[in-house]
Amino acid sequence: MMVPVRCFTCGNVVGEHWEEFKARTREAEEPEDPEKVLDELGVERHCCRRMLVSHKDLVDIVSPYQ
C-alpha cells in the first residue's frame, strides 16, 4: 500500500528516501541501479534496503474500492 515510514526491523526512517528512490530507479528514462541509488542516499542496512526495493505502490489500484 503506502511506503512505510520506518523500517520494520530496526526502526530507522526510510520513508524520506522513497520519492527519490522511485524517481531514479523506476520512473527515469534510463533507470539507475538500485544498489547505487541506495548507497548514495545513505541507506546502509540490508533490512532498510529491502523496505525500499521490495515495496509495490498499490494505493492507486486499491483506492477505487474504498
Curated annotation (Swiss-Prot):
Entry keyword set: Cytoplasm, DNA-directed RNA polymerase, Metal-binding, Nucleotidyltransferase, Transcription, Transferase, Zinc
Domain of life the protein comes from: Archaea
SUPFAM superfamilies on file: RNA polymerase subunit RPB10 (SSF46924)
Reactions the enzyme catalyzes: RNA(n) + a ribonucleoside 5'-triphosphate = RNA(n+1) + diphosphate
PROSITE patterns for this protein: RNA_POL_N_8KD
Primary enzyme class: transferase
Primary location: cytoplasm
Listed GO CC annotations: cytoplasm; DNA-directed RNA polymerase complex
Disulfide bonds: none
Compartments, as annotated in UniProt: Cytoplasm
Protein's recorded name: DNA-directed RNA polymerase subunit Rpo10
Originating organism: Haloarcula marismortui (strain ATCC 43049 / DSM 3752 / JCM 8966 / VKM B-1809) (Halobacterium marismortui)
Biological classification of the source: Archaea, Methanobacteriati, Methanobacteriota, Stenosarchaea group, Halobacteria
Gene name of the encoded protein: rpo10
